[in-house]
Amino acid sequence: MGKIIGIDLGTTNSCVSILENGNVKVIENAEGARTTPSIVAYANDGEILVGQSAKRQAVTNPHNTLFAVKRLIGRRFEEEVVQKDIKLVPYKIVKGGNGDAWVQAGGKDMAPPQISAEVLKKMKKTAEDYLGEPVTEAVITVPAYFNDSQRQATKDAGRIAGLDVKRIINEPTAAALAYGMDKAKGDHTVIVYDLGGGTFDVSVIEIAEVDGEHQFEVLATNGDTFLGGEDFDMRLIDYLVDEFKKESGMDLKNDPLALQRLKEAAEKAKIELSSTQSTDVNLPYITADATGPKHLNVKISRAKLESLVEDLVQRTIEPCRIALKDAGIDASKIDDVILVGGQTRMPLVQKTVADFFGKEARKDVNPDEAVAMGAAIQGAVLAGDVKDVLLLDVSPLTLGIETMGGVMTALIEKNTTIPTKKSQVFSTADDNQGAVTIHVLQGERKQAAQNKSLGKFDLADIPPAPRGVPQIEVTFDIDANGILHVGAKDKATGKAQSIVIKANSGLSDEEIERMVRDAEANAEEDRKFEELAAARNQGDALVHSTRKMVVDAGDKVTAEEKAAIEAAVVALEAAVKGDDKAAIDAKVEELSKVSAPVAQKMYAEQSAEQPQGGAQQAEPEAKHDDVVDAEFEEVKGDDKK
């Protein structure tokens, strides 16, 4: 039996790993990098470029360079998130023949799994070059919040790439698996906070040691499949576009070439601001008009970036709250917080997570590689090479069917450990009803129409009988990959019908020495620059917090106070754009002085408020009879498929 590789098929970057001699090895690609950009490009000569080579030519070939395709996988064209993405990417998103969101490049319409397959082929080739033997089996990870269609489409991508996908596992579970191999003895409850390029999810995982074996159980999971580093980049891009428009009067939104350069610059600036207080985005010849070429040069502070993305970071907290509630665990009971995904390197994200969970997150797990490493461990478990790990994953959303009155009746509740099988008996709504439609749904809403439809099928030839007499057994079976199989059987005749829910679908010594000499010669200049950057940062942060305070205060701020604060804010904003640290300090002092009375009012009010305690209401346990008179809608003759 060949090796089973572990692949993290990411929105922004992908990674491949293998378990060798008991150690997990992340495999470098042909370019020597441990991660590969999840980018596929179609060149004019018909060549397909994948990874870094595709990313390099993106500026000159924006319409045929496909990135972040994972955000489209297993999605319908009409979905709001797809329509939103159409406005944001330079390539074309089109409606496939089956109603799915497809992409257009190189003169062809292609399904997202075809594009993802090109990335998987690159991962497969990377592993084969390292191992010196063919690789045909893999474990591929997906966001925990991926629905059934998205999981199936990911499996399809593996098949297109020539891989037998042995298991689809959740990214946070994989990360915990990578972390758990060398963990301390005893039981642990871990939060995996995974903020990647295009998706966010959070999982509460219990790692129990049972007779020397490590048992990983996902207690709860939650997230947002359309929130990630790409959204942070877009905020920065929008800001740069607005700043350029203010300065030159030209809108770069309709220039794909300019947008592609802006995307690269924004990503670079965002990464730099995780380790520095300010950076410059300098793009010469970004565009041109009748007067000649135009150049973009914008200085961005860390505080400015944080103000642009603050709401995105806050959006990650509600899923954390829900996951803890679903798991029935208090934040104080969490032993470790693991950060996964490149976007978690942002200081604001780390601070927000630490504030919410009341503890610093661990930094000993590489956020870019942990998921692929976990997938490789799971591959070794399946191959029988690792025997002391048991993985218990969960279904992320409730699954059920539509019953009379447009109600969704749940068969498998969310956060149920998989694989699982559940049956329930239903009956007919009308006398002599000859057929029923089984409408399979996924979601948390009681109203069927507000949940995601996974598919429909009919069970016909039911013998005539009064309503409520026929017994129709509906069975939901989720396999270890999270793929759903649904069956319906008339218990009287034994007639059955079933459906598998599918997706429609480093520096040299010389350079270091030169830098040291330069730094010594320019130490004074560097010190002044650092002080100026810190002052600008403080100014930007004060502007943002003051404006937020005024909004929060509402009518507690008088018109005179508001006018004085706004004037001081405008003066500080002007000073921050200059190079005079003393002027910035003076304006900071001025704004602090005029806003102090409002801040005191707010503080006094908050102190007066008493913290409110809440009691949890216990839900009475519902009793289920063997037969649920849920009553299907009748299938009319012309409705049958």
Curated annotation (Swiss-Prot):
Induction: By stress conditions e.g. heat shock. The modification Phosphothreonine is found at residue 199. One of its GO terms (molecular function) is ATP-dependent protein folding chaperone. Keywords: ATP-binding, Chaperone, Nucleotide-binding, Phosphoprotein, Stress response. InterPro entries: ATPase_NBD, Chaperone_DnaK, Heat_shock_70_CS, HSP70_C_sf, HSP70_peptide-bd_sf, Hsp_70_fam. Residues 604-619 have a biased composition (Low complexity). Residues 602-641 are annotated as: Disordered. The keyword Metal-binding does not apply. Residues 620-641 have a biased composition (Basic and acidic residues). PANTHER family: HEAT SHOCK PROTEIN 70KDA. NCBIfam families: PRK00290.1 (NF001413), prok_dnaK (TIGR02350). HAMAP family: DnaK. Belongs to the heat shock protein 70 family. Acts as a chaperone. This is Chaperone protein DnaK.
